[in-house]
Amino acid sequence: MSAFEQLFQGRLPRLVMFDLDGTLVDSVPDLAAAVDQMLLKLGRKPAGVEAVREWVGNGAPMLVRRALANSLEAQGVDDVEAEYALELFNTAYEDSHELTVVYPGARETLKWLHKQGVEMALITNKPERFVAPLLDQMKIGRYFRWIIGGDTLPQKKPDPAALFFVMKMASVPASQSLFVGDSRSDVLAAKAAGVKCVALSYGYNHGRPIAEESPALVIDNLRALIPGCLEPAAEITLPDAVPSHSGNSIVVVTRKLWMKVIKALARWRWRA
């Protein structure tokens, strides 16, 4: 039985929101290379892939602080040094996606959902300047109608603001929405938004099993979302399906829109 069949009583969610790093793509090798290059320029020892794998998930500024502290807690880091180190990291990572790969089943799942008419959004804590180039290189960006980076809004996950915004824009309630992620921040954001969360066992959760965060379901492969493992599923229907707009428009939310976002969220939360 697929995740959709378990969570939505034989129906598809109308909206599926995805995390990026650790969910759709394994970006740790490139992130680790950028972190190590940053550390070497600061006269420090490189951290290595396994350490970086436990540090990612809360955005680039926190990753840099953890690398400087050489610990997950990121304590005792000088703010000025952290700011300079972040510039070094950003420069190193800007065009560094050669080692990043799409996880098995990700492309097939996105393609299947797109064919079923399910709206999709990408909500990541990765700085937005890195998101579009990565999606283009991985050839998965066209599937997402809304793309929100970690610095697009004043809040990032685990704050649910981005989830509320996407649901508002899609006119889809939480009961017909799903979030797919791999970390504690993803699960907390989904729970705060009243959205079911499916978590991937293989992602980045600071070395802790994602099941400890109590998502609605844990899966080992994105194909597990799909009825019949990507086979046609005539028995699975969209609830109250709304015809999609003509064309394949993609909305990349920018910082210029954040005031409108906050106002919209405030009105929506008040009505709720």
Swiss-Prot record:
Enzyme Commission number(s): 3.1.3.18
EC category: hydrolase
Top-level taxon in the UniProt lineage: Bacteria
Keyword Glycoprotein attached: no
Keywords recorded for this protein, A-Z: Carbohydrate metabolism, Chloride, Hydrolase, Magnesium, Metal-binding
GO CC annotation: cytosol
InterPro entries: HAD-like_hydrolase_sf (IPR050155), HAD-like_sf (IPR036412), HAD-SF_hydro_IA (IPR006439), HAD_2 (IPR041492), HAD_sf (IPR023214), PGP-like_dom2 (IPR023198), PGPase_prok (IPR037512)
The keyword Transferase appears for this protein: no
UniProt catalytic activity: 2-phosphoglycolate + H2O = glycolate + phosphate
Residues annotated as binding Mg(2+): 19, 21, 182
Pfam family, one: HAD_2
Cofactor annotation: Mg(2+)
Function of the protein: Specifically catalyzes the dephosphorylation of 2-phosphoglycolate. Is involved in the dissimilation of the intracellular 2-phosphoglycolate formed during the DNA repair of 3'-phosphoglycolate ends, a major class of DNA lesions induced by oxidative stress.
Protein's recorded name: Phosphoglycolate phosphatase
